[in-house]
C-alpha cells in the first residue's frame, strides 16, 4: 500500500489520538501532545465526514475539559490550526481555546512599557464570492491579492489586510456578498509571494501591481 507523506502523518495522528483516548479512559491526565492529537484527529475525521466548519469548531471546543489534562496544558493549547480535507476541498480549520480553563491568566497579556502602535484608518469594502467554492482569507493576507473569484474594488485594497485578530480568518461562501473592514499592513510594508502581484515594497510598487492584477484577471 502506497501512502503519501500527508496520509502517513494523518495515520500517525490517528494512532496517537487512540493511545491518548485509552490513557484518558484509565484516568490518566493528558499531556500537551496527547490532548493535541485527540483534537486534531477529531477535526480531520469530522471534515472527512463533511460536517460543517462551525460545527467542527464547536465540537472541538467540547472534547476535553481542564480536568482531563495536566496543569498548564489549556494555556499552551490556546490555538489549534489544521488543514483538513472536506468533500469540496482542503480548508484551514482554526480552533481558539479548545480546552476551557478556570485560570484568570488564560488569554491575558502583560504589556511591556513603551510605545503602542494604534491601528490607523480603516475602510469598508463589499466583497462577493463569484466562485463555486468557499474562500477563506487570513488576517494578514494582502487583501489586494486574494483569490480572483472575489469581486470588489481591488485597487482600494492595495496595501491593506483584514481588520481582525491575528490568526483568524474570514470565510466567503459561494455567491455570498459580505462587507469587511480593512486596515493598512504595518511593519516593513513589504509583500512577496502570495499571488505574485506586489513582490516588494508597498510604497513603490502600486502602479506595477495594479497593472499585473489587470493582466492576470484579478481586476
UniProtKB/Swiss-Prot annotation:
Its EC number is 3.5.1.5. GO terms for molecular function: nickel cation binding; urease activity. One of its GO terms (biological process) is urea catabolic process. Its main location: cytoplasm. It is an enzyme of class 3 (hydrolase). It catalyses: urea + 2 H2O + H(+) = hydrogencarbonate + 2 NH4(+). GO terms for cellular component: urease complex. Gene3D superfamilies: Urease, beta subunit, Urease, gamma-like subunit. InterPro entries: Urease_beta-like, Urease_betasu_sf, Urease_gamma-beta_su, Urease_gamma/gamma-beta_su, Urease_gamma_sf, Urease_subunit. CDD domains: Urease_beta (cd00407), Urease_gamma (cd00390). Pathway: Nitrogen metabolism; urea degradation; CO(2) and NH(3) from urea (urease route): step 1/1. Keywords: Cytoplasm, Hydrolase. Residues 102-219 are annotated as: Urease beta. The keyword Hydrolase applies. SUPFAM superfamilies: Urease, beta-subunit (SSF51278), Urease, gamma-subunit (SSF54111). It is found in: Cytoplasm. Residues 1-101 are annotated as: Urease gamma. Heterohexamer of 3 UreC (alpha) and 3 UreAB (gamma/beta) subunits. In the N-terminal section; belongs to the urease gamma subunit family. In the C-terminal section; belongs to the urease beta subunit family. This is Urease subunit gamma/beta.
Amino acid at each position: 500500500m502506497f501512502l503519501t507523506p500527508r496520509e502517513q502523518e494523518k495515520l500517525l495522528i490517528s494512532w496517537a489520538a487512540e493511545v491518548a483516548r485509552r490513557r484518558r479512559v484509565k484516568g490518566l491526565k493528558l499531556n500537551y501532545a496527547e490532548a493535541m492529537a485527540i483534537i486534531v484527529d477529531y477535526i480531520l475525521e469530522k471534515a472527512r465526514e463533511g460536517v460543517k466548519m462551525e460545527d467542527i469548531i464547536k465540537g472541538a471546543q467540547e472534547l476535553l475539559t481542564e480536568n482531563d489534562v495536566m496543569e498548564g496544558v489549556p494555556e499552551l493549547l490556546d490555538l489549534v490550526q489544521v488543514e483538513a480535507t472536506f468533500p469540496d476541498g482542503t480548508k484551514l480549520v482554526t480552533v481558539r481555546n479548545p480546552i476551557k480553563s478556570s485560570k484568570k491568566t488564560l488569554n491575558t497579556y502583560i504589556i511591556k512599557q513603551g510605545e503602542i502602535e494604534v491601528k490607523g484608518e480603516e475602510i469598508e469594502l463589499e466583497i462577493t464570492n463569484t466562485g463555486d467554492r468557499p474562500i477563506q482569507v487570513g488576517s494578514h493576507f494582502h487583501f489586494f491579492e486574494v483569490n480572483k473569484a472575489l469581486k470588489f474594488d481591488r485597487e482600494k485594497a492595495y496595501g491593506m489586510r483584514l481588520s481582525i485578530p491575528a490568526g483568524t480568518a474570514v470565510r466567503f461562501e459561494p455567491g455570498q456578498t459580505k462587507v469587511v473592514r480593512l486596515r493598512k499592513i504595518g511593519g516593513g510594508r513589504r509583500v512577496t509571494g502570495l499571488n505574485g502581484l506586489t513582490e516588494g515594497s508597498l510604497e513603490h510598487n502600486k502602479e506595477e501591481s495594479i497593472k499585473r492584477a489587470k493582466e492576470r484577471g484579478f481586476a
